[in-house]
Amino acid sequence: MSLSVSFIFLLVASIGAVVADSENVLVLTESNFEETINGNEFVLVKFYAPWCVHCKSLAPKYDEAADLLKEEGSDIKLAKVDATENQALASKFEVRGYPTILYFKSGKPTKYTGGRATAQIVDWVKKKSGPTVTTVESVEQLEELKGKTRVVVLGYFKDAKSDAATIYNEVADSVDDAFFAVAGSAEVAAAASLNEDGVALIRTDGDDSETSTIAEAEITNTIALKQWLHAYKLSAVTEFTHESAQEIVGGDLKKFHFLIIRKSDSSFDETIAKFTEVAKKFRAKIVFVLLDVDVEENARILEFLGVDAKNTPANRIVSLADQVEKFKPQEGEDFEAFTNSYLEGKSAQDLKAQDLPEDWNALPVKVLVASNFNEIALDETKTVFVKFYAPWCGHCKQLVPVWDELAEKYESNPNVVIAKLDATLNELADVKVNSFPTLKLWPAGSSTPVDYDGDRNLEKFEEFVNKYAGSASESETASQDHEEL
């Protein structure tokens, strides 16, 4: 599992309430699937397992989305398939995990990439089922759109072929969780606070509704516009919940400043006010997130961030751009100073480090932690094969007996070390672990690792080690000959 993806997985995991199924969600089986897909132009299909926690969490939101679409008289259908009872369908559409959601347009499936909240599901299927960009001809039409769609993005360009207009259309074609339109007149543009060429984002969230604009001169490339849209689709500070998680981490802005605090704390109101003030200053550069320590489901995120609940309030910055990187403020740095320091590249990574166990060298598989990693793995006199793992990772657990047996094979060879490092407790600045398990070998005489991506069995592991170190028996004989000389 990708480490970045696993972080997102932690964010979206929670247990949903048990509610009655909606009659507006079609129940599909192998007997009626083809008929339903071919008989409706737009169908969103959820493949689920009854025992799946994430499926249970999604169910009420999925049902609500179906009900809303029905109320609006939409032609879009929402359906579900119990993949455990319809395994032929699950196999046909390559269902590898639950829930898997596919969108069928005229019978052709594409992967659902939207969020898990009701409004996000509705907005996504509407976007996919209609034109990429709609022309809004009147203020009344704009108001109607605002009433039906949580996020409306409105462009206004006097020159429809300008660079900014071209960038806008490209972004509209690639962003699925917002409704994109262009103003048909200056009057419509003005109703969205656009008094000159540019883009407005209108977010309708009850008391937290907001209209934000960006001028044409600032629309210089698609990445910049996507990041601006991501920032302003969210509140200045967004509380992490099951509904908001996908929207927080799923956009194009991959930098996050977390305020970790109990909402029940007496200092909460004052602290969140200061955090929000800073968030508004850095709105399009970093996403500001509130994490409530009192919410039980947030415990694993605290673990990921390396924050003890007893030591809160606290704050951390996380980047998911290329790989996972975490930062914590220096002593005395307030929210603004820390954010500035990070954005200017002055903040050092916050790397976890486990204490070295006294018996780290007692078994054939040597235990590495941050403090002894360089000494052992980068020892140029030895070939060192390291397993980077997570205790909760299923694939890592399956690998344990094979890795133990491999270590036993080379235990008498002084030139080969088989080791393991718990990457959830130890982070290394110069070694990036992007999946679990990650296997890397440092050949003798080299500080550059070789990644292993072959089959995870004893025979293949031995072949790999021997390629760089010679066979266990050959190395042992060579060592004995050297001692005799």
Swiss-Prot record:
It catalyses: Catalyzes the rearrangement of -S-S- bonds in proteins. The active site is at C393 (nucleophile), C396 (nucleophile). It holds the Pfam family Thioredoxin. It is found in: Endoplasmic reticulum lumen. Gene3D superfamilies: Glutaredoxin (3.40.30.10). Belongs to the protein disulfide isomerase family. This is Protein disulfide-isomerase 1.
